[in-house]
């Protein structure tokens, strides 16, 4: 995934400019890149699945609230995804503070993890979306 990240990132940005969400953009960019690679080289499915998974995990590093951080650090490929995130800092795609936060988060005890997540409340642009209730129409009979 590290070898192909720069091209995947460029493809992702082109999809974002077309109006796709961050997750859909990276999903399409990764699929397109892997199709190009498979025309010239042979990779086993398990390696292709790993590359795809590492790329898709990058979108989850933007979520600091709720259960997302806890489920991400339990993921089997979390450490590899964190290394890819560190590479993205060198490419100026991600702030170093993000990598430091995730590194500290996965190493600290559970009690501190809860405090870290609560400490991020209000600092991120994340907001929970709620469905708007529809008003009942009053009958005029």
Each predicted region: which residue ranges?
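Catalytic cores of the polymerase beta-like nucleotidyltransferase superfamily
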Residues: 1-141
